[in-house]
């Protein structure tokens, strides 16, 4: 079992007034560090999310013409692939 520290109440495991007084000077710095760390991590997350989720409609990319024969062949390949995947499940 864990031994309680001198700075903890042995019955409730709460910090004693001495421990609270000892930690008081560091509260502001620790909170500043926490806010800075969360801000940087959140900023990176938001930047990445916005960079990856741009509205790309690919309007400037030319689409090559597809003949009816090629389209029919692609549809057959797609249907065959779908059947194979369904059989695997």
Curated annotation (Swiss-Prot):
> TM spans, by residue?
29-51
Mitochondrial matrix side stretches: 1-28
The entry's localization annotation reads: Mitochondrion inner membrane
The UniProt keyword set, sorted, is: Membrane, Mitochondrion, Mitochondrion inner membrane, Transmembrane, Transmembrane helix
What is the membrane topology noted in the UniProt record heading this document?
A: Single-pass membrane protein
Specify the superkingdom: Eukaryota
As recorded in UniProt, coiled-coil segments are: none
What residue ranges lie in the Mitochondrial intermembrane compartment? 52-89
Family membership noted in the UniProt record: Belongs to the COA3 family.
What is this protein identified as?
Cytochrome c oxidase assembly factor 3, mitochondrial
> Gene encoding this chain?
COA3
């Amino acid at each position: 079992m864990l031994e309680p520290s001198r700075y903890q109440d042995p019955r409730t495991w709460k910090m004693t007034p001495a421990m609270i007084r000892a930690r008081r000077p560091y509260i502001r710095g620790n909170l500043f560090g926490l806010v800075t760390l969360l801000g940087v991590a959140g900023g990176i997350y938001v930047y990445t999310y916005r960079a990856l989720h741009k509205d790309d409609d690919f309007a400037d990319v030319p689409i090559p013409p597809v003949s009816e024969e090629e389209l029919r062949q692609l549809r057959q390949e797609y249907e065959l692939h779908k059947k194979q995947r369904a059989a695997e499940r």
